[in-house]
């Protein structure tokens, strides 16, 4: 039985392509020494600063950082542990700063009797202060350091 030369060529080409695909699976990775899904130990979490001192802000409208640990705080649709101290009626009892008046405004600027739902989840903007080292060099400069001295006299 004779096989047509075209079929023989196609069969050989398919075998060669299959072998090439199998070899391509073992191609060197471009991501370095570790395989992409390898298990690597996570670095330790940075220590939370818990001195309860307010930290200065670097720019207007910067959300203040949280100067205490919030580990274990419940923050869900049903409960917000932050409001137990920072809500208007409780802040004086525990010497905690009251949440900003802007947290009582809706999108249109209308004042509400309680915290606006869009401001309810505190950790969307506020984070605990830690002693973590920056991952990149911080080149932020305050606006006052960028202004020429001649503008300050005006």
Curated annotation (Swiss-Prot):
InterPro entries: Multihaem_cyt_sf, NapB. One of its GO terms (molecular function) is metal ion binding. Pfam families: NapB. The keyword Methyltransferase does not apply. The keyword Transit peptide does not apply. Heme c 2 binds at residues 103, 122, 125-126. This is Periplasmic nitrate reductase, electron transfer subunit. PROSITE patterns: MULTIHEME_CYTC. Gene3D superfamilies: Flavocytochrome C3, Chain A (1.10.1130.10). It comes from Cereibacter sphaeroides (strain ATCC 17023 / DSM 158 / JCM 6121 / CCUG 31486 / LMG 2827 / NBRC 12203 / NCIMB 8253 / ATH 2.4.1.). The gene is napB. Keywords: Electron transport, Heme, Iron, Metal-binding, Periplasm, Plasmid, Pyrrolidone carboxylic acid, Signal, Transport. GO terms for biological process: anaerobic respiration. The lineage of its organism: Bacteria, Pseudomonadati, Pseudomonadota, Alphaproteobacteria, Rhodobacterales.
